[in-house]
Amino acid sequence: SAFADVDKRYVKKRMLGVDLSSRDGKGPTPVTFFENKSPKKTEQGEKLNLDKFFKAPGNFSAVAMKDGKIVYERYNKKLKANPDFHAHGLSLTKTAVGLTVGHLLCTGKINSLDDAASNYSQSLNNSIYKDITIRNLLRMASGINKNRDNERKFNHLMRNRRDNGTNNLIEVIKSVKTKFSDQGEISRYHSLDITAASILVSEITNKSVAEVFFNNVFPQINPEGSLYWWVDNNKMSLGMAGLYMKTKDWANLGNYMNKEITS
């Protein structure tokens, strides 16, 4: 119950507070909106009662699927959740960036994950990421992230939490000057490597990650809703977080990934 109480406060503060206001464009973080003009209907399966796993005070919404069909849905009315609410995926946004990089690989825009990212990005070529491979960006194994001590500072900059126009992904990456190890030696969870991946996608395509994802990956999940995505002051999508979709579409995304893995 202690965890549930903490989780409930987290949902109220983050999902219904700062993050929700950002999604609506009311906070300091700019947001882009991509309208789904051809919404699909997710197939329903035989219902299962999974309340023992998901019916908690702090659980905002939950969708479970089996064989690509919805078998369980729950929307916490006390937290004003509903099927049409576009929920913030938090760090699952990183997964969407990874899928977008995968799309560029499959379509030949990237030759190999073992290429240096700087082969495709002038901004990364002029940074400490000059020699880092795309594979090690995706693995968070650049050797640049020793720990998460400096993460909050960078995250606040990228989200424009200072509200002073310093939310520039490229400048954040260029401000980093030191490594702690050679790339590929160890994976360290951090915002910087996925930020570099977002820059990579933008400089390959001259489009934001959000736009490339929306046009090429999103349709394949048969989405019911639209999507929102945080951007910096150059309309470059944040990689660390900031993607909002309907709960069903987060489930559809997971189902799509499972099918891709097993195909």
Where in this protein do the model-derived segments appear?
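N-terminal leader/targeting segments and the immediately adjacent pre-domain N-terminus
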Residues: 1-79, 106, 110, 139
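Solvent-exposed, acidic/flexible segments
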Residues: 43, 47, 57-58, 85-93, ...
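Non-transmembrane alpha-helical segments in soluble domains
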Residues: 51-54, 102, 118, 135-138, ...
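Active-site SXXK
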Residues: 68, 87-112, 137, 197-201, ...
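Flexible glycine/proline-enriched surface loops and loop-helix/loop-strand junctions
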Residues: 81-83, 177-183, 193-195, 232-239
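Active-site helix/loop module of the DD-peptidase/beta-lactamase fold
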Residues: 107-145, 175-178, 205-241, 245
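Catalytic cores of extracellular degradative/oxidative enzymes
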Residues: 120-124, 143, 147-167, 174-181, ...
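Active-site-proximal alpha-helical segments within enzyme catalytic domains
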Residues: 193-200, 239-262
